[in-house]
A protein has these predicted regions:
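Bacterial N-terminal signal peptides that target proteins for export
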Residues: 1-10
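Bacterial N-terminal signal peptides
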Residues: 9-19
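Ubiquitous "structural anchor" signal
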Residues: 19-22, 177
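N-terminal propeptides/low-complexity segments immediately following signal peptides
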Residues: 24-43
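Non-cytosolic coordination micro-motifs
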Residues: 44, 50-94, 98-224
Length: 224
């Protein structure tokens, strides 16, 4: 009889343990109406938080540019402590913003911070004129790109558009500089955008690179 009572007690304890275990398992499971965030959503939220955290302590010019581009184009493709980059955003091949400011006094004092570029076939004979018109123009003949570094996207549109007109002979260096100053004044004082600051006035080619050709003994591996 004593053994029977012990067996019954052990069985009762076992059943109680199973019941508590099952109850605990049920409470850990999400309710039917709950929805777990998708992996992509979690990564996007993490990237968004990271970009905002990174630029929070940046210098004024790059921080302002970064905030404007995030608002317009969404999250950058690359984020580091010193730079953020978008690829193929809008009409641009890329947009790069670094946490640094470069003093630039044309046409009025400001700080360059944002580099944006497009595909473009650069004519070497026009390079001097383009750079004389605006020193913040960036030319890369090998990759086939032209870009500008300024503090605002409309100013980069303006810089690249007028560089195109200098390259094509539509405007002289002086004419391009005068037009640049006029367009900036219209944008800053009248809060209006003209054709030069609203977007690109030309269609960038799909591929404009110039790979050049082998030269000298090194280029031909010693073969004649």
């Amino acid at each position: 009889m004593k053994k029977l009572n012990q067996f019954m007690c052990i069985g009762a304890v076992g059943l109680l343990s199973v019941g508590l275990s099952a109850q605990g398992t049920d409470t850990q499971q999400p309710m039917q109406g709950d929805k777990k965030p998708m992996q992509g959503e979690m990564q996007h939220a993490k990237a968004n938080m990271k970009a905002e955290q990174v630029i929070a302590s940046w210098k004024p010019a790059p921080k302002m540019a970064a905030e404007a581009m995030i608002k317009k184009y969404g999250e950058p493709a690359e984020v580091t402590s010193m730079r953020i980059i978008w690829h193929n955003n809008g009409p641009w091949k890329y947009t790069e913003i670094m946490n640094q400011e470069t003093e630039h006094n044309f046409p009025m004092p400001h700080k360059d911070a944002m580099h944006q570029a497009v595909n473009y076939k650069v004519d070497p004979s026009k390079a001097d004129d383009i750079l004389e018109y605006d020193g913040s123009i960036i030319l890369n003949r090998t990759a086939g790109m032209i870009g500008a570094i300024c503090d605002k996207e409309p100013a980069n549109f303006l810089a690249v558009n007028l560089a195109h007109e200098v390259a094509t002979g539509k405007k002289s260096v002086d004419e391009a500089r005068k037009q640049y100053a006029m367009s900036i004044e219209t944008m800053m004082k009248e809060k209006k955008m003209d054709k030069y600051t609203s977007g690109l006035i030309f269609e960038p080619p799909a591929n404009a690179g110039f790979t050049d050709a082998p030269f000298g003994a090194m280029g031909t591996n010693g073969k004649k």
